[in-house]
Regions:
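Short, glycine-/polar-rich solvent-exposed loops and beta-turns at beta-strand/coil boundaries
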Residues: 7-9, 168-169
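Conserved inter-motif catalytic segment of the P-loop NTP-binding fold
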Residues: 8-107
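Phosphate-binding/switch region of NTP-binding enzymes
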Residues: 15, 80, 88, 100-190
Length: 190
């Protein structure tokens, strides 16, 4: 499945802040992808993945992660910052709202995620991995992006959203739904 039509002129510098998978399992999963040797060689200098972090992306967490990003890429800013998953580092702000609270989600996106990007690489793209709420298959088929926790705030924030789900629990096939805020609709991909 091809998602990008154009390839960047050089490998993108990616900082992958992950707070879910232990290092050895993450390494095993990466090895299972079986990337070409040239891609692996390029990634040695351009792809930094953290071990499973136990950090809250509050004001102190933003400062600590910004410092880690600068240390990982001392010569140039990252092109992409990945946060995976939102749930494990979520800070809903002074009201203490959860990720299903749209005001708390907007606080997190504006006061934590955007501040992190602005501190290290204002032009960087952001990829946020997020869990979905429990919905029926019918609800997901009608509007898959309502499955996002904090959906209204998230959908107002991103320029493109992807949801991967299994339309039939009896089969291993996954469906990728694509939502663009500033472009023509794209068909779902299997």
């Amino acid at each position: 499945m091809v998602l990008m039509v154009e390839l960047p002129p050089q490998p993108l510098r990616v900082f992958y802040l992950q707070a879910e998978i232990q290092y050895h399992y993450l390494r095993e999963r990466m090895q299972q992808i079986a990337l070409p040797a040239a891609v692996i060689a390029a990634a040695r200098d351009t792809f930094i993945a953290t071990p499973k972090l136990k950090i809250l992306l509050d004001a102190e967490g933003v400062a600590r992660v910004a410092e880690a990003i600068r240390a990982a890429f001392p010569e140039a800013r990252p092109d992409v910052i990945v946060i995976d998953p939102i749930r494990n580092i979520f800070d809903g702000g002074p009201e203490g709202g959860g990720e299903n609270d749209n005001a708390a989600m907007m606080f997190f996106l504006q006061q934590r995620v955007e501040q992190l990007r602005d501190a290290v690489a204002p032009e960087a793209g952001i990829i946020l991995a997020h869990h979905t709420r429990k919905l029926t298959k019918k609800q997901v088929s009608e509007d898959p992006f309502q499955a996002l926790s904090g959906a209204s705030a998230l959908r107002g924030f991103y320029t493109s959203g992807l949801i991967m789900h299994r339309p039939d629990e009896e089969m291993s096939v996954r469906k990728l739904e694509i939502e663009l805020r500033n472009g023509p609709a794209l068909p779902a991909k299997l």
